Amino acid sequence: LQREEMTDEISASICDAYGYLNELMAKDVDLFSLAGLHSLIELNHRVLCGSDTRKRYEFHSHILETRKKFHGRIRPIRSWMIKNAGRLDPYEISAGFYCRMLCQPQLFIEGNHRTGNLVLNYILLKENEKLFVVTDETAFDYLEVSGAIKLSSMKRWRDNLLKLPSHCGTFEAFLRRSASPDYSRDS
């Protein structure tokens, strides 16, 4: 799979999105509540455009198309999250969300890896778990397992029954191994 080069502009947008995520955490926003869904899609807009109004204007049609597709694609993911909240541990929930949003059809038009990483850390942070930050040491494995997930489809029964659970388990194990106390709330 072709990997996008990490530029200063991409890094700035990701930092902007993390700042927004910090605001959401301070307000105790539930991203998977009906009211929180706007904030969830805003995270995607932030990782792609930041909060710069000129850039947002430039990508206005893309933002509108993303919102339209998002509202159709979030339902099964949100249902799964609600059904499993409190039943599964935070790493299982994080991996389950990430797999479901990254497989086909992807939740967003672009920025699924970046937004997914933010949201899985939001889930872990809410439960006071260690966070996962992509580093030079974890990037290759993260992108490899993410690439396998990305090639799976929620709409193909074989993928849904066989591949997706396997990918979720692999990603969950990767998260548990790679999460670091260096990025916790207390560090």
What are the residue ranges of the model-derived segments?
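FIC/Doc superfamily catalytic core
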Residues: 1-187
